Amino acid sequence: AIKKKKKSVPVTIENKSGFKGFFSNNLFIVLAFVIPFVLMTAAFGVMKVSPFGDNQILVTDLWHQYYPFLADMQEKLKHGESLFWSWTQGGGVNYFALMSYYLMSPLNFLTVFLPSEWLREFLMFSVVIKVACASMFMAIFLRSLFKKNDFSLVIFGCSFGFCAFFMGYYWNTIWLDTVCITPLVALGTVKLFTEGKFRLYIVSLALSLLTNYYIGLFACIFVLLSFIAYNIVKWDGIKKFATNILRTGIYSLIAIGLTAFFLLPAFFGLQNTNASGATFPTTFAINIGSTNDLMGVLEAIRKILSNFITFVPPAIKEADALPNIACGTLSLVLGILFFTSKKISLKEKIVDGCLIGFMIISCIIRQLDYIWHGFHFTNMIPYRFSYLISFVLVVMAFRAFMLLESSSCWDVILAALFVALVI
């Protein structure tokens, strides 16, 4: 008798009670936090960063702005001083507005329990924790979306946590909270679209805006792009589409409303600042290519694609740098397999390809770059939304990994060769 080939099914997530049960159910989620935590701590140890040596991570804006602001906040928390006004910056400053951009990481409030001389070490470990959280949240997203519970969650979680954006901009601690929350915003968005559940969406989006409203803007744009992509792939008539618009709009407004007590002071505070490059570009121009034409765009695309390679050193603070988008060779090869898999519909391939393509083009065309960054051009550190490209690629790679059994060895080899040829 000929035996029928068994279909591969996702690993069932058992729900066991008690502490041991919780640990057993979430073993790979825990590992997705612990392993990056250990690796980042070891890396700082090898680099002899304090407390492991005499070096420190206080560079550029972290040294000139974030560290002094955090030291001031620590003093205010310890001595019960006002969080609405400060006399330590210039002739006085609206401290509430300053906090809304620079100091709203939940970890910062833990400094009230620390001696002031430990602040540098605190900042180092806060980076470690945020990288570990990014990996863990990515693992949670992948497990919930694909119903798989094995060590692959750790691997792909780390692909996001150790992506070039984190490694290049680790010193920009005020951004990292919102970036590491991105998988939870995406998971909340998925649950809102597919199940009508709104709690995670509201809480995660509100936290993204609260921890840093500037990077939170990218989360809002990503929700919009996800909404468009989902409704194209899962089109179910105009009535369902209208319902989705209404539901997403209402819950998004609730999330924004929950943070209004911080966003409004920040908005009014921004009216008193000088913005960099606040004029919308009226003529076609590109950021990366050498000429403002089709050939320049193609040149820019080639350069950006080359930056997917893992061993390309990430940009740290160069204004003319390429976007930090590398997230591992595995993600890159599996990302190619995503487009060759027969198990994935053509519509899904086109939509996901267009999503990544749009974000890449947004790095090139100055008008799109201007819109992404809140109708401004950035002052150093370009393409601040580029972490979303890494996020989407890792998700696509995991989708292809789930269907790897349907791909032949030659498919994998050809995908790797294609990556080497194009990049």
Per-region residue spans from a language model:
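Membrane-interface junctions at the ends of membrane-embedded or membrane-associated helices
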Residues: 15-21, 145-148, 190-200, 230-243, ...
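Transmembrane signal-anchor helices characteristic of membrane glycosylation enzymes that use polyprenol
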Residues: 27-62, 251-268, 357-361
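Membrane-embedded helix bundles of polyisoprenyl
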Residues: 36, 128-144, 151-233, 247-267, ...
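Active-site lumenal/periplasmic loops and adjacent helix-entry segments of GT-C-fold
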Residues: 43-146, 150-183, 207, 211, ...
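Membrane-helix boundary/interfacial segments in multi-pass membrane proteins
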Residues: 56-57, 166-176, 319, 357-410, ...
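Periplasmic/ER-lumenal interhelical loops and adjacent helix-loop junctions
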Residues: 60, 64-75, 81, 106, ...
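Membrane-embedded alpha-helical segments of multi-pass membrane proteins
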Residues: 125-133, 176-184, 220, 326-333, ...
